[in-house]
């Protein structure tokens, strides 16, 4: 009897650096590459049309690349637990390979499939290639707990074994005599479906700003590295108006779907740095967003409640407001703040926004202005953001809402001043909010302050053609900072964490506390690897390296009822606080 192998694609939609597929092919007589698509999931899940289109383009590209090797992709409708027992029998399978999935849901799913495979006498090959490191080894090195500060994570990574080189690309030489049994009705049975077949209405759908697939990913990688001439001086390009637009060298959606190997990216960066710096070893910060990606994956891998506040041992329990109307205005770009609305419009139209734009809208929704739970924002990003990834999306939202990882809650983005500093002329606003196109730069970020005559000339009356601001930012941000301060003071008393820093008393700009200048070193929000093309860097928040465990296990009840009153804590309470150290480091 021959050796019949199946490789199951999930993420990792590529033929380069695919060690599980490469090992599966070795010694096999036949190989079939499958992708399992649940049609019910397509119609009911919280995933928008742009993300589905990107995925289908990835599958089409993968199929096209397999065709060049006299093989094909088998897209199978159904659920894995139902599909595999049938395939094992029908195709007489003896070997199954998968890329290791570190997320709790993926681990549970894969354990069930491995059990079915064992019962059917099928060998299972699992290899790590979606992350740079074996996350379990990082946790083991840290005494069995995930590191919860980036500084600690860097320390652990520096002690790890050197990374393995990327696996050879699957070519006809690698496949050798291994064949793929194909039938004449392959397209009918196993073809990649269209958006329409999945039930999506594509009328009025604009062309993709981010085309999916490995071919596009590798082209972008080469362009990205060509732009990395700044590596010579180890400097980052400054953020400007153009940074806000989708870049032809952006990589984050490709890393999220595994069209691009993070290992290949890592080693290409390393080679470039060594070439420029005459073989000196690159600092960890060169790999900025790749390491933030690993950090969040590590934090999430053993925590099935990572995307929830309640029951999540690393998440501060904050009594957020429930306000569906305000949430809808934010999600649909109807807040009355052009900077926020333009960002949310770009997100809905294109499926991507710059990482600092993510910070701005996340802060506005949560601790900055609306005091709505980060879980609600995370769900909107999950629907709309091409690079939304369970671990990174949840981790970034906890981080940006000061619910975990980061406690400098007095750093608040101003929804007027931040945009104005980034794009003084307002071209970004005009592009995504054409209704405001007629406003001069002086008023385009706060059009409600424009005299009525200017509004008439612009053919846009505030409150009629464009909404008035939904909130007074100066008042809301001040109140919310006080709310956060009280929550963290209670934390400090209950747990002795000493996480508070002194709160500046005078907000600048339009009442917002500008915590970060555009282009500062901060991790991306909600992204699979962030926007690597922008050279985004790192801001390290080190509270020492002691482990932060169960920040507020007591939950909501322990915090009393006065937390939203805005009452300023006493000077004695202020004196008990300990300010976190902020460490800057050059970015990648």
From Swiss-Prot:
A GO CC term?
nucleus
Binding annotation for FAD: 252, 289, 355, 387-389
Residues forming the motif LIR 3 are 151-156
Cofactor detail note:
Binds 1 FAD per subunit. Only a minority of the protein molecules contain bound FAD. Contrary to the situation in photolyases, the FAD is bound in a shallow, surface-exposed pocket. Binds 1 5,10-methenyltetrahydrofolate (MTHF) non-covalently per subunit.
Q: Where is this motif: LIR 4?
A: 255-260
Q: Where is this motif: LIR 10?
A: 411-416
Key word Transcription regulation present: yes
Q: What is this protein called?
A: Cryptochrome-1
Post-translational modification, as annotated = Phosphorylation on Ser-247 by MAPK is important for the inhibition of CLOCK-BMAL1-mediated transcriptional activity. Phosphorylation by CSNK1E requires interaction with PER1 or PER2. Phosphorylation at Ser-71 and Ser-280 by AMPK decreases protein stability. Phosphorylation at Ser-570 exhibits a robust circadian rhythm with a peak at CT8, increases protein stability, prevents SCF(FBXL3)-mediated degradation and is antagonized by interaction with PRKDC. Ubiquitinated by the SCF(FBXL3) and SCF(FBXL21) complexes, regulating the balance between degradation and stabilization. The SCF(FBXL3) complex is mainly nuclear and mediates ubiquitination and subsequent degradation of CRY1. In contrast, cytoplasmic SCF(FBXL21) complex-mediated ubiquitination leads to stabilize CRY1 and counteract the activity of the SCF(FBXL3) complex. The SCF(FBXL3) and SCF(FBXL21) complexes probably mediate ubiquitination at different Lys residues.
Motif: LIR 2; annotated at 82-87
Its annotated function is as follows:
Transcriptional repressor which forms a core component of the circadian clock. The circadian clock, an internal time-keeping system, regulates various physiological processes through the generation of approximately 24 hour circadian rhythms in gene expression, which are translated into rhythms in metabolism and behavior. It is derived from the Latin roots 'circa' (about) and 'diem' (day) and acts as an important regulator of a wide array of physiological functions including metabolism, sleep, body temperature, blood pressure, endocrine, immune, cardiovascular, and renal function.
The taxonomy runs: Eukaryota, Metazoa, Chordata, Craniata, Vertebrata
Domain comment from the record reads as follows:
The LIR motifs (LC3-interacting region) 3 and 5 are required for its interaction with MAP1LC3B and for its autophagy-mediated degradation.
Question: What are the Photolyase/cryptochrome alpha/beta domain coordinates in residue numbering?
Answer: 3-132
Q: Which gene encodes it?
A: Cry1
| Annotated GO MF terms | DNA binding; DNA-binding transcription factor binding; double-stranded DNA binding; E-box binding; FAD binding; histone deacetylase binding; kinase binding; nuclear receptor binding
Where would I look for the motif LIR 8 in this sequence? 379-384
Q: Where is this cross-link: Glycyl lysine isopeptide (Lys-Gly) (interchain with G-Cter in ubiquitin)?
A: 11, 107, 159, 329, 485, 567
* Gene3D superfamilies, A to Z: 1.25.40.80, DNA Cyclobutane Dipyrimidine Photolyase, subunit A, domain 3, HUPs
Q: Which residues carry this modification: Phosphoserine?
A: 71, 247, 280, 570
What is any Pfam family matched here? Answer: FAD_binding_7
Q: Which organism is it from?
A: Rattus norvegicus (Rat)
Which controlled-vocabulary keywords does the entry list? Biological rhythms, Chromophore, Cytoplasm, FAD, Flavoprotein, Isopeptide bond, Nucleotide-binding, Nucleus, Phosphoprotein, Photoreceptor protein, Receptor, Repressor, Sensory transduction, Transcription, Transcription regulation, Ubl conjugation
Induction remarks: Expression is regulated by light and circadian rhythms. Peak expression in the suprachiasma nucleus (SCN) and eye at the day/night transition (CT12).
Tell me where it resides: Cytoplasm; Nucleus
State the span of motif (LIR 11): 430-435
Oligomeric state and partners?
Component of the circadian core oscillator, which includes the CRY proteins, CLOCK or NPAS2, BMAL1 or BMAL2, CSNK1D and/or CSNK1E, TIMELESS, and the PER proteins. Interacts directly with TIMELESS. Interacts directly with PER1, PER2 and PER3; interaction with PER2 inhibits its ubiquitination and vice versa. Interacts with FBXL21. Interacts with FBXL3. Interacts with CLOCK-BMAL1 independently of PER2 and DNA. Interacts with HDAC1, HDAC2 and SIN3B. Interacts with nuclear receptors AR, NR1D1, NR3C1/GR, RORA and RORC; the interaction with at least NR3C1/GR is ligand dependent.
Ranges for the region named Interaction with TIMELESS are 471-493
Residues of the region (Disordered) are 511-588
